[in-house]
Amino acid sequence: ERHVGRKSTNNLNLTCQWGTCNTTTVKRDHITSHIRVHVPLKPHKCD
């Protein structure tokens, strides 16, 4: 998860640093879900 990091040590904002994205969230699970925009992971095979 090297593309996810805190903007600074004085706040709780998590920033996506994938390319030029820079999407910011306050919860780790939100940024983890956001990363799926960049990684086309399909957990289930379509029929």
UniProtKB/Swiss-Prot annotation:
CC per GO annotation: nucleus
Q: Name one GO biological process term.
A: positive regulation of transcription by RNA polymerase II
Q: Which compartment or compartments is the protein found in?
A: Nucleus
Q: Which domain of life is it from?
A: Eukaryota
Q: Name one GO molecular function term.
A: DNA binding
- Xref: SUPFAM superfamilies: beta-beta-alpha zinc fingers (SSF57667)
Q: Which UniProt keywords apply?
A: Activator, DNA-binding, Metal-binding, Nucleus, Repeat, Repressor, Transcription, Transcription regulation, Zinc, Zinc-finger
| ZnF locations on chain (C2H2-type) | 14-38
Predominant localisation class: nucleus
Its biological purpose: Transcription factor that mediates regulation of both acid- and alkaline-expressed genes in response to ambient pH. At alkaline ambient pH, activates transcription of alkaline-expressed genes (including pacC itself) and represses transcription of acid-expressed genes.
Q: Which family does it belong to?
A: Belongs to the pacC/RIM101 family.
Name of the molecule in the record = pH-response transcription factor pacC/RIM101
Species whose genome carries this gene = Penicillium expansum (Blue mold rot fungus)
Q: Which gene encodes it?
A: PACC
